[in-house]
Amino acid sequence: GITVNPKIEKLRLKKIKNYILCLMLSQGVPMMLAGDEFRRTQNGNNNAYCQDNEISWINWNLAEKNEELVAFTRRIIQLRKNHQVFHRETFFSTKTPEIEWFDFTGKNPDWSNPSRFLAFMLDGSMCMNGDGKYDNDFYVAGNTDIYDVTITLPSPHKGKKWYLAADTSIEGNDCIAEPGKEECLSEQKRYILPAGSFVV
């Protein structure tokens, strides 16, 4: 519902960014409803086809009001488009480690543990971009717990380093880097991921 509480609004914005990030970095075709990128909720009505009123109309003023989310969505879509590893032409094989799963300690996750953290690494050497070069490796982690977690990062492949592409815990437009402007992490072995956040 409608609120003027800044803490609730901040949490909602972060959760929306988390959902859009997960959608855009998943395999397959991402499906968004017009206006998701600027918080058009239809007041919770997910079956508004017969509503010829404010519920189903698109209020374009929301795009200006929620410019930060529009910019985030634009950049995460660009990240997806720039990297074949996020939209592969074939499904993962079991013969090569195209995708590896991790818990926060950097080990294989215990799938029976009700942890609120999960991470995966996509091997870019298994995908070529449109320019004929192998893609980058990507590590994506989600912490849905109410506590911050210190992640043990997997070792990057030989000659590579980890760069920060997105962190939904960071406020404003700095939560996602412009393509080509990602910052190299000063700490290559660990990363503190705040509660309820995702990092790429």
Predicted regions and their residues:
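Alpha-amylase-like alpha-glycosidases and glucanotransferases acting on alpha-linked glucans and related
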Residues: 1-8
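Carbohydrate-interacting/catalytic domains
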Residues: 9-13, 17, 22-32, 36-200
